[in-house]
Amino acid sequence: MGKLRILSGKEVCIILSTHGFCEVHRRGSHIVMQKRLVDSTITVPVPNHDEIRVGTLLSIIRQSDLPRSEFE
């Protein structure tokens, strides 16, 4: 496992978008991204900050079910 890059909220949303997530709405400083599957829906809130902290980024990765390598 490589080291995670420092990403902005906008960059994270672009990565999620390339994997089928779409922006549902914005509220304050957060963007809610959602991916509909056959039997469920994955919802991931993304803070719209210049730099997302590592712990927050790990939480987004875990919630989105995407491989960590997509964010490195």
Q: What kind of region is each of these model predictions?
A:
Residues 1-26, 30-72:
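Basic nucleic-acid-binding interfaces
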